[in-house]
Amino acid sequence: MEKEEKLEKTNFDVFEDLKRRVRFTRKARIQASKRLRERHEFFEKVSYFYSLLVLIFSVWFLNMGNDKENLVATKILLIFSLSLTFFTMFLNIKNYKERASSFELNYQNLDILLNKIERRECDPESITDEEIKGLHREYEKLLLEKENHLDIDYYVSNKKTREKYASKINQYVWRDRVVKCLVAIYPIIIIFAIVLYTWLNSLLAIHL
C-alpha cells in the first residue's frame, strides 16, 4: 500500500514538473518570436532607409562638375549600394521573419500540449507511467523540431526570472541598442570618413 502511494506521488511530481517545463518553454518561445520579429522589422527598415539614401544621392550627384567631386560621389554611391546588398543578403540568411513564424507555431503547439496536461490534472490519481511518457514524448518532439530559443528569451519570460537575471537582461539590452545605433548611423560614418579622407588628400596635395 505504501509502495503504491509512493508511486502515485512520484508520478504526480513528474507530471507537475513536466507542466512547469512546458509552461516555461512556451513563454520563452513567445519571447523568441517577438525578438526575431522585432529584429526583422528593424533590419527591414534599415534596408528601406539605405535604398532611399541610394536614390537620393543618385539624383543629387548627377552632374557634380569636376572629376574629383564625381569620384567622391561614385565612392559614396558604391558603398551605399554594397551596404544595401549586404543587408538584403543578411536578412535572407538570418531569415528572421520565417523563424519568428516558426516559433509562433511551436508555442501554439506547446499551448495545446499545456491545455491537455491541465485537463488531465483534474484527475491526478489516475495518471499512469505510460501517460506521462507519452506527454514527455510530445514535449520532446516539439523541442526537437524547432531551433532552441536563447537564454535571454527565458530571462524575460516572467517576472521572477526578470528580477533574478536583471543584470544579464540589462547587458543584452544595452548591447542590442549599441548595435542598432551603429547600424542606423553607419551611412553618416561612411560619408564623414569619405569626406575626411578626400579633404586630407586635397590638403596633402596642396602642401606637397
For the regions a protein language model found, what residue spans apply to each?
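Alpha-helical transmembrane segments and their immediate juxtamembrane boundary regions
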Residues: R37-S101, Q171-L208
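Conserved non-transmembrane functional hotspots
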Residues: E2-V46, N92, K97-V183
